[in-house]
Amino acid sequence: TPGTGLLASLDEAITSAAQLGYPVMLKSTAGGGGIGLTRCDDEAGLVEAFDTVKRLGQNFFSDSGVFLERFVDNARHVEVQIFGDGLGNVLALGERDCSLQRRNQKVVEETPAPDLPAATREKLMAASVELGKAVNYRSAGTGEYIYDAHRDVFYFLEVNTRLQVEHPITEACTSIDLVEWMILTAAGQPPALDIEINPQGAAIEVRLYAEDPVRDFQPSP
């Protein structure tokens, strides 16, 4: 998400936060484990937290540097399935919404992503194809993004360079066998990617988790 470099003073932090728009996250540049990480909903909250976060960074990590990032309320996790042949051709096969999560793990995945504007969907596809082409991507991969529905903008998270558990819902709506494509590509016979993708219908995948209620719902085999 949009953010700043290291902040030299509280005044600079206040000016930068106003430009980013509240809420913002004040972060210690050397932080870890949530130490030196504070949400600020307004200028008063930023003023109150600034010296504390700097002090935590210095005490725990010998580095008092801090910076700001925009905080996205009710952020959605949207990802795009791509496939590249390693020859410069990349195809986007639609998006998946993976926003319903528990313990930072995806629980419900669905395609198409609900309430995603058509223009935003097109931008997501184009950005993912451009990303794949930039690295001459080969095989299946997933571009992952944070989507801010309030501002109707998305921010890049990462690329998962493998076939993900939720890939069958994309297969169900495109009638494309991604595993077959991966095998063909590995065998030196990549599929033609100059095709038009028009996903049909909708699909949902749900993961089942076993948890132990006696042990604070820790994962249980």
Annotate each PLM feature.
Residues 1-29, 36:
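A conserved helix-loop-beta module that forms one wall/lid of the active-site cleft
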Residues 28, 33, 41-221:
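ATP-dependent carboxylate activation and anion-phosphoryl transfer catalytic cores
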